[in-house]
Amino acid sequence: MANTASAEKRNRQAQKRRARNVQVRTGVKSAVKKLREAIAKGDPATTQAALKSAEKTIGKAASKGVLHRNAASRKISRLAKAAAKPAAAAAK
């Protein structure tokens, strides 16, 4: 329990930030899930659209400080690699 007015305010601010961060993180998870589903279906057009959407969502999360920029970069890189794998297999 906060003892001072400033501690109460910091608690309110932390709760607001946490709610916002949870919302952003949920959006990232949803975008990644949609991309993985598109990859599993094997449709290149859907996969590319989902990849673009996921990259945008992850980039925004990194710019807001919800994800570390290196973690976001790593996540985007791995998703792009996973999205490219079926296309490369189809080209062979």
UniProtKB/Swiss-Prot annotation:
One of its GO terms (cellular component) is small ribosomal subunit. SUPFAM superfamilies: Ribosomal protein S20. HAMAP family: Ribosomal_bS20. It comes from Anaeromyxobacter dehalogenans (strain 2CP-C). This is Small ribosomal subunit protein bS20. The keyword Lyase does not apply. Keywords: Ribonucleoprotein, Ribosomal protein, RNA-binding, rRNA-binding. InterPro entries: Ribosomal_bS20, Ribosomal_bS20_sf. GO terms for molecular function: small ribosomal subunit rRNA binding; structural constituent of ribosome. Belongs to the bacterial ribosomal protein bS20 family. One of its GO terms (biological process) is translation. Residues 1-28 are annotated as: Disordered. The lineage of its organism: Bacteria, Pseudomonadati, Myxococcota, Myxococcia, Myxococcales. Binds directly to 16S ribosomal RNA.
